[in-house]
Curated annotation (Swiss-Prot):
GO terms for cellular component: urease complex. Belongs to the urease beta subunit family. It comes from Herpetosiphon aurantiacus (strain ATCC 23779 / DSM 785 / 114-95). CDD domains: Urease_beta (cd00407). This is Urease subunit beta.
Length: 130
């Protein structure tokens, strides 16, 4: 045994996470010239403006991947990603400043979508990307 080593029994069944939460699949296109990496719990609606996707569908969601992992987008990439709704208090602060408050507050979604347009974040309806 090494110092700090963990000895973990193998689970007898698969670990299930995010059960009962809303999910969606999005096609994301990277139009920039540098790789972009997005962490597991970043509010996907607010990711780099060079990623083009339906931000309205991504509002209030993060990547449906294990905590502490990330998805990398290379320049010119297009890929389908799976998102899951945030739980808890559903308050988002920081990131790119498009929400900075409660996701479910009156008019917050529309205010945030207006900010996407004003600040020229990549946004296209899902059907327009396919």
């Amino acid at each position: 045994m090494q110092p700090g080593e963990y000895l973990i029994d193998q689970p007898t069944e698969a670990i299930a996470a995010n059960l009962g939460r809303a999910t969606c699949e999005l096609l994301v296109a990277h139009t920039g010239d540098r790789p972009i990496q997005v962490g597991s719990h970043y509010h996907f609606f607010e990711v780099n403006r060079a990623l083009v996707f339906d931000r309205g569908l991504a509002y209030g969601m993060h990547l449906n991947i294990p905590a502490g992992t990330a998805v990398r987008f290379e320049p010119g990439d297009s890929k389908i990603i799976n998102l899951v709704a945030f739980a808890g208090t559903r308050q988002i602060y920081g990131h790119n400043g498009l929400v900075n408050g409660a996701l479910d507050a009156v008019d917050q979604r529309q205010t945030s979508l207006n900010a996407v347009q004003q600040q020229q974040f990549g946004h296209r309806a899902q059907g327009d990307l396919e």
